[in-house]
Every structure is written in C-alpha cells, then in structure tokens.
C-alpha cells in the first residue's frame, strides 16, 4: 500500500461537483436522489472474482483505488469514512480541502467498532429521514453484516431509497478528459488484440484447415495481455501505434476473450469459450479490457464463405449499427436510439425483428455495464455530451436457408463498439477495427470455373447504331457462336432492365403515395410583400413637388396620383418607357399583374389574383430629357434588383462551414507544389495542402490569407486521377454543399493538381548528337518521364489515402476512375473523356468538371439512337426532380453497348429513342403532380419508344421473310415457268424479251440499222456546226 498516491485535486473537484448536483437535485420534486439527505456506500471484503459495481466504482472515481471493508457516509457538507488504520493513513492527505472529510479508524475491539457505527447512524438521523443506498449492493463479509444490524436497530424511522441512477448521472456517466483518455487507450488495446492479432491467428487456422478449439484460441489471445513486447511493437490497422505512455500492467480483462462458431452462439457472452473446434462459417469474437479502471468492449463477426442470405443479413446489421452510431446526439433519449434501429429493420426486413437483440447497448466507464443506462425500448434516460456507451447490435438464432453442414443450420451476428456522445456525430473509439462486409468476409473455397465472356464485336464508327446489327463478321453458321452469346447477353440485359423499370415504378408510387401538387417538384412560389417605407418621414424630400421620384436607396418609384405621393416598390414594376408625341413627352410605367402571359412571369404569385389591378400609368410632360432620365433610372434599378436577387439565389445553398481545427502538437501532413482549381485570384503559383484534425487547408505562398478550407464533414466524394494518359495528376474533392473560393467563386468541386510533364527540348544537331548514334537520349528521356509519372502517382495517391484516413469518421474513401470503361462525350462544350468510378461518373481533367453520383440517378435515357447516325446523347434524370436533367452529348456510337453495359451493371434503368426530347417540359409535368405521373405509368412512356425501336435483332436484318412452306411452293412455281432456273432475273421486262426471241430480227439486220442511225447522227452534228460558223460571220 506504500505506492498508493491519491490525487487530492481530482478528489476535491469531483466530490464538490457531486455535492452541488446533489443539492440542486433535492430542490426538484422528482429528483434522482429520491429525497435522500445522506448516502451510504459500503465495501465488503475482497472478492475472489472482482466485479465492478457502483460501490467500488465510487471508490475508483473519487480515490483512484478500491478500499475493501470501508464505509463511506456522505452528507451535504461532510464525507465520513470508516476504515482500518492502514487505509486511514492514505486518506489523511485528503483533509484540509474545500469539502470536509472525517476519517474514523476501526480496530479489533468489537465494542469500539459498534460505537463508531452508532456515531454514523446518528449523523444519518441528523441529516434527515431518508438515507440513500445502492439497491443491488453485492458487498459481503462480517463488516457489512455488522453495519446492517446497527443500521436496522438505530434507524428504524429512516427509510432507505435507491441512489443508483443518481450516482450514474452525476458521477459516472459524463467523463472528464482524464477518464476519456483512459477509455481511448483501453479501446485501442481492444482493437490491437482483435485486429491484427486475433484476425491473423484465425485466418491462419482456417487457411491451414487446422482443428483448434475455441478455448485454445481464447487462451492464446489471453496470454498476449502479459506480453510486454507485443504492446510495444503491435501496429494498429491504421498503421498507427498505441500511446507511448501505455502501461500494460494496468490492462485487465472484463470480457473474454469470447470466441464462438459452429451454431452455438450466446450474444450475452456470459460464459467462457467452449471446447468445440473453430468452425469455418460465422465466427464471433468479443473482448473487453479495463485500463486504469475504465472499460472498453469490442465484438466483430467474421463470415467465412457466406451465402447470399448471410451476406444480406450482415449488410443489414452494419446498416443498423452505423446508422444509430451516426445519429446518436446529445439530448436524445435511450429509447429513441433503440427505436431508430427497429425502424430500419421494419423498413428493410421486418421478418428479422424477432431475431434482434432487446437492447442496442449501455453506458460504460468504471462499470462494465451501467444498468441505469441501457439503450432499450423503455429507458427514458437522456444522453449527454461526454457520456461513453457500448453500442451492441446483433441478430440471434437466425435459420440458415442453405446450410453447408450440420453446424451451419443456425447462426448469429453481432457488432460492438465503444463510443463517446457529443453534440454532433459521436467519436467511435474502436473504429479502427473494420465492420464492413468486404473487410470481414473470407472466401477460401475455389470458385467454379466460369466460361470466359465472349469478346465484344469491334464496331466500325462509320456505321450507325442500328445498321451495325445488320452486318455479320462471319460467313459460316459454325462461326457464329459469338453472335449467339452476344444475343444472350442482350436478352439478359433487356430482362434486367424490365425488372429495374418495374422497380422504379413501384418505388415512385411508394415515394409519392399521395398527390404532391408541386410539393415535391416545382417549388410553390409564395407571395412576397415589399415594404418601401415604414413611416411617412422616410419619404424623399423631393415628393413635396409632386413629381416622379426614383428612390434608388429604397428600390422605390414614388408617383404623384390625385395630388398625393404614392410609392411603388420596384418589384411591382414590369418596365418603364418614354415616347414623344408632338411637343409632349409621355412616361409609361407598366406594372406586373396576373394574366399577362409573358415569358417566365406567368406564374408570378399574387395575394388575390381576382382583385382589380392597375396595369399601367402614363404621365405627360414637356421636359422630355427628364422623362428619358427617369425611364433609364427605373430600367437600371430593375436590372440591379434582378441581379441582386439572382446572386442571392445563387448563394442560397452556400453554407457557412465550421472552423478548421488545426493540428498544433505536430507538423501536419503536407503535399507541396500543387495548383488549385478553381484558381485563386492573382498570379498562378503553386501552393501546399495540409491535413488537419477536421479538414484540409490549401495555402497560397503569395499570401497566407489566400487559403481554402475544406472540412471532412462537407466531403461527398474523394477522387484520385492518375497521370496515365493525362498531362496532370489530380486529387479531386466533390463537396456536399458549395463553398466560396477565391474572388466570390461558388463551387462544389475543389481540385489539387500538378503537371506531369516537363518542357522538352529538341537537341537535334547539338554536340551531344555528334557522338551518339541512335535514339539513346530519347530512350533515356522516356524512361525518366515514366519514372517521374509513377512517382507522382504514388505521391498523390498516398496523400489521398491520408485524407481518407483522417476523415474516416465521415466515411471518406478514395475512389479512382476506371479508364477501361470510359467513353468520349460532350457534357458541356468540349469533347472530353468521361470515366466511371465505384460510385460516380466523372470527368475531372478539364473544367467545368462533371461528377454524377449514381445513387442520385433515377433513370437514364439514350437519345438519337437510330440508323445512320455516328453518335448519340445520354440524359440523366435525378431522383430529386427539381434538379435539371444532365446531358452528355455526342457520344460515338461504338460506345453504345459499353454505355448500356455500364448502366445495367450499375442498376440504372435506361431507355433509348431516336429523337431528342424536350426535358424542361417533361420535368415540369413530373413535378406538377408526381403522384399522378407515376399513377399514369411513370417513365414507361420512354420505355415504349425503346421497345418500338429495339425489336428483335432478326426483325432488323430483313424487311421481308417467308416461312419454309411458302418458300418451297415459290421455288416449284419458278422452276416450272422458266428454263433458266434459279439464276434467272426477277425483272419482268427481261423475261418478256427472252420469251419472244424467235419472233425478232436477226443480228445482220440489227447491225445495219445501227450503222444507219450512226451516220444520220453524224450528219446532223455537221449541219449544226456549219450553222454556228455562219452566225459568227454575221
């Protein structure tokens, strides 16, 4: 006990805070202390298997140590501690603080000890008629029994009330920084044992097909706790290390390690790992550690050769787990958290609700499980910033529809993480151990050999889309197997598209189950009131002259009507014009009114469209120059107001970002010598990008104030574009909400790039070339450029990965374009190369950039797909029907099948047609009443065009085709009517001449007539030539 050092500062801070909360609670009617004016916390003898409950938790919270056979009596102004002499020595140092403490020493004399107990009971009675105790107190031993006997005898009129919830709320639930630091360390230690250590051991066993018992594997993990060298060298999944000040001696087990597989699962993890062998199926591992008395727990499910049903169930579990973690906030109740989880199950797979656990977690800290903070369907406890929770989601007793053996008939799934509640998204202490299906699924069985997919037919770009189907590349039927395979692929694609179209129709009817009447689509415009002046004294001074006054400051035109100045806000005026008639000039001011039906103003809202409106006012004056000036002022004011409103509208979706939290204690990760797009104002020079705690920052070297901050919470997609086939290497960030970059440039895309090529010089004829024959120098230059490009790719990809790791709590992942699936097209004005990624279709090399998120696409339509055209267009319609459809035009027709394959594999329903459609009109119809649109068939009107054009390939090869019987009859009749067989011409005129051959003239006669006609024609030409000469002479 000589090494015991109690931190008196922390003791005083915590007990003062606790006493203040207690006093405030007593003032409320339904306080958590239940009106207790004194509190008793008992500790019995040391237990063989130590368990942490609220009685020893209060010891650790206040003193940092557990003092067995010790009684604590709290009153509102003093703490009394009854303990042995040895322990009392360590408590003496706490005296003299702000909160008084009195230490009572008990010895071996039973009578003296009883007097001390009686003294404490007197203090209880002095405090009040209620004493707070811990209801489920597990303390045991003679010391406890003696106290209970004295308390029962001397405090008969004092009632005992439970203070468990009060201790949890005011002492244990909300952690300070030192407590959170201990929990983070415990969590990292859990992650280190789970992955890489347990994961590697399990993988090796399964890979080698060894027979290892659960208990044996658990013991192996257990022994690592005492392996000091392991804790010094272990590397976490993020390649990071454990804290340098980690003391392995202060680590202790609170759970497991528990390993389960082979159909026997207990998600309470109440018992030890059994002696069954590790089974290659669903494997669950759970473990919990305590560090400096603070607990953390982790559990993961690993799927070995799972079937589709198991994968589907696990993906549902990860969806539930990640969703509730993301949505937990300060102020939510425990039952709301559980309700969110059940709501997801009911919407996705209602049949799984009966297998779901009865709670989704509990409070954790000094206690492994706080029974007053269980996240179930009944608990009304409010979560607060600083609380730490175990989030434990799982399904149990699930029947396997396709068991691979007798041990796979039933399985369970569970995920457990330790988190900290904040006012925004929680901090997940155990996040470094992955939970995704991709990371936790293992496939050891060899997949069945599949036949290689037939190569696509290379198409001639000079031939139209439809015409290519009429050209065969083979002569013999035996060579046409590829054609048949392509037809099968096309058939499967058509069937899949029909399924997708039906699914879209169902989803549309479900999303818009009631008439929307513009509530989803075109935004219903509201009548806006404009107030020029609030009081009379705000009118311009010039109104005294009863003349037309243009008040630019208040965007108002004041007109004299019936001897009184009447203000008209500029938004009520349509336009103003000046005209001359004789010696008079006329100023005509037109106002906005319903029913004008001009341009985009037809839907201009009015408070009462049936009221009487003044459409125009005309003023007459002999001062034409003044009226000309007034008309110009009104026009300029109108233009400025419209421009201002447009700028305001453009900036509506620009949100003010939180401040970037800079890294102060170390140098941030930096990528230097990069350019930014959109470019900053001023000279174009390369800057640097830094990764900080909650985002990244670009800094210009010219001015430190010229910087761009991008927060991880605002990152929607992160792309790395290698410099292969390009002149630059790129890190591209697509944002959720636009930000302002440079000189008031609004953008949703921020890009950092570096040029991949240096300036090349032609060294032909220089001295070096004199003595070097061949292309050695060109070869060296090419090699050097290849090395430089590879180094740039490695540098930028590595930095992109660092950004993703820093923003992993926001779900940021690096995505790369797949060049093999790319195609040329014109999304704006220039022809660019568009490439798909995992989640998007992008073009980030040339501005303006193009980023289309596949999940946001409702349907795609291919336009101008018809015979003879060398290219086609593609239109994306988004699920948010208020967004304008996105066009990618002039795609070469040889990419048609490739584009269709990409859309089909991305589960995007597509249609095709021969013409360009009027999409603004179509979307206006959709948004006018979306429910009615889907009730009338939805997008099926596009599908109808596709079906008419698409037909069966056999129909396109010939416009006329006979069946075999008709063909036989036709052959027989043609043989009977002609002696020339199948080689005879089908032309009727030729047949008539041949049939009458015996009645015609012979060859000599025909030749003679021909010569005569030649002579006659020659004479006619001579006569014509002579006549021309005569005419010239005249």
UniProtKB/Swiss-Prot annotation:
InterPro entries: Creatin/AminoP/Spt16_N, Creatinase/aminopeptidase-like, FACT-SPT16_Nlobe, Fact-SPT16_PH, FACT_SPT16_C, FACT_SPT16_M, Pept_M24, PH-like_dom_sf. Keywords: Chromosome, Coiled coil, DNA damage, DNA repair, DNA replication, Nucleus, Transcription, Transcription regulation. It is found in: Nucleus; Chromosome. Residues 444-464, 502-521, 942-1034 are annotated as: Disordered. It comes from the Eukaryota. One of its GO terms (biological process) is DNA repair. Residues 945-978, 985-1005 have a biased composition (Acidic residues). Residues 452-462 have a biased composition (Basic and acidic residues). Residues 480-507, 625-659 form a coiled coil. One of its GO terms (molecular function) is nucleosome binding. Belongs to the peptidase M24 family. SPT16 subfamily. Component of the FACT complex, a general chromatin factor that acts to reorganize nucleosomes. The FACT complex is involved in multiple processes that require DNA as a template such as mRNA elongation, DNA replication and DNA repair. During transcription elongation the FACT complex acts as a histone chaperone that both destabilizes and restores nucleosomal structure. This is FACT complex subunit SPT16. It comes from Gibberella zeae (strain ATCC MYA-4620 / CBS 123657 / FGSC 9075 / NRRL 31084 / PH-1). The gene is SPT16.
